[in-house]
């Protein structure tokens, strides 16, 4: 396609960042790549071009923008469709303009290029790219401004997958003029005046999906491209009937052997790492089992000690209760005897006072002056004081008994509180056993 002679102003130009897909990232099986790995692409620089410029025209001038060293010899344009990058075909290169690679038509002003891998000299593999989708410079000869191609390019049906046959065919290509049995080979690519058999052969090769790409350096005019397209479509029907096909991708793999060896090394390393992880997991499981056994043994010891302490508390509490109730039974009879003795003592005290008072009355007329100094009066005072002392002693004994009982009750309450705290601690730790609560209520 011819370029527009009128150069646009700088304000009308768009800036595009050019990226190369690194080797090994392209998915040759699906013939695509996800946009998630765009961050791993290799930058080739940026260009300022007209948004109306087509990809076909940019292919011819890309070396001027980025430099010959920065541009790959053979490459394909990629376009972002959804979440993946797809290959742009040759026919689409003449239709797509650079404005479709910049906002608002695209998320980012970026242009992606896929270098084509060289395996058999002039033969290039790019998965399922057709002959119409890519041109190769090394596969054609330019003489006096015209493109020449051998008419014996189609392979034999008996050997469709032999790469040596194809390689030998291209080795004999420079000497095709010396062969007497071959047909005239000078022809202009896409000329509608070509012989029918040669045009059908070329179009058949162009419509069959193959891993081989051919480069055409001739810039055809728009009308000639349309005529060539019509001729290729007409010859496609003849090609389908003849069932002529090129070798499959299996005969010419696109992946180098170094990549396969690196994958094997990576696989072996992954296996080694997996075995190490499995060994570590086994060791961790064994350590866990050992620690669980130790934990079970410690729990059993704690339960045993807890049972022993619980039995000691039960025994002490039971013995104390037994002594208390036995003492209480004996105390009941003793209290009855004590009450009776106290009553007798009170009666005896009252009788003694009555006798002393009667004696005092009889002796009063004789000793009116020394009543306070009489012997009988002193005896009465001594008896009253002795009675008061006895009452104080009895009160002291009663208070002492109450104090002893209260001390014992406080000790029992402190023991119960300690037991409750131990139970609460066990519950917080989540132990399966639980200590009982002893309520030592002693009747008074």
Curated annotation (Swiss-Prot):
It comes from the Eukaryota. Residues 145-229 are annotated as: Disordered. Keywords: Coiled coil, Cytoplasmic vesicle. Pfam families: SPATA1_C. Residues 268-403 form a coiled coil. GO terms for cellular component: acrosomal vesicle; cytoplasmic vesicle. It is found in: Cytoplasmic vesicle, Secretory vesicle, Acrosome. InterPro entries: SPAT1, SPATA1_C. The keyword Coiled coil applies. Signal peptide: none annotated. Residues 145-160 have a biased composition (Basic and acidic residues). The keyword DNA-binding does not apply. Interacts with IFT20. This is Spermatogenesis-associated protein 1.
